[in-house]
Amino acid sequence: MAAEASAVQQLAGLLDQVDAPLKKTFELNQHEYGSKDKFTVVKVDGLADSLQNVTLFFDLSHTFGIPGNVHQGYPTETLLRFLKAREWHVNKAHRMLEDSLNWRMQNEIDSILEKPIIPVDLYRSIRDTQLIGLSGYSKEGIPVFAVGVGLSTYDKASVNYYVQSHIQINEYRDRFILPTVTKKYGRPITTCIKVLDMTGLKLSALHQMKIVTAISTVDDLNYPEKTETYYIVNAPYIFSACWKVVKPLLQERTRKKVHVLRGCGRDELLQIMDYSSLPHFCRQEGSGSSKHSSGDADNCFSLDHPFHQELYSFIQEQALNQELIKQGSLHVKIPEQDPEDAKIVEVIEAEFHKLGVQNGSANGIDQA
């Protein structure tokens, strides 16, 4: 582990040299959060003992106070995430992190939780077509996010609104949900679990490839290694065919995160979470995601679900403390996609077209 510890220390030293505005968005906002709590050096993959002397960057906690923006009081873990995402190449990780901090500053990500999507009917339409929600927590306290991949249509608002909503969920997760469970369990919890429901996945999903790619690029480059495990459930043939060609292109680290479960995955998921935390589409075979989430408080995709009610109310409250709320989406610049990820998207698109031809669809997009 000495090499990994050395990489963390090198990256910390490089980050200590960035411009003050970038350093601020990585660190803390003292006037918002209070004063002078020390950071914890996180035990990650047995690195804790080796990291005891990594003090150059982390001693800044005495100046800036308790956790705020990017690292939430766990800078070691954050540096490790960027290093893992770049296969432990320090210079590449530094470039990635600096680019991410620039992206946050240029797009005002630190204040995105002060910018509600209004009117509420528009936000409800987004929730009905961008299916994601917090279904509960694992037995170890890790947040479980459910994603309705197959039935998300992204067709009721502009790309900008969907990207804004996705980033708001990311930021709320990182600033509030994860710190809350960290405090509850007395140990750092900095990642989540995602259960991806493939119910309804068809070749017509090719139409949503652009927006899905935009959202995944935002995640890959600015929220790396935030998902501990991906569980795939209710997978139709089209997913299996695409997974077969995509899997060899993924880094081994990523492949190990993906678990394709039988059917709705209920039995396997109950080994790591209680029934109350199971996404609604995993509770019985054939349940699947609901295409329209409105009016169902048990459906974690719905605006009526406690998670989305809490999130939307919080953003509205924060906005009241700012200037007059303005209608219109927040335009967030999508970072340039990593070449390796772009190749994977090309492979998926090619496989979709191939399957379309095999199924006799002239346009290659209409069959299940």
Task: For every predicted segment, state its role.
Residues 1-368:
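Basic, amphipathic alpha-helical/coil surface patches used to engage anionic, phosphate-bearing ligands
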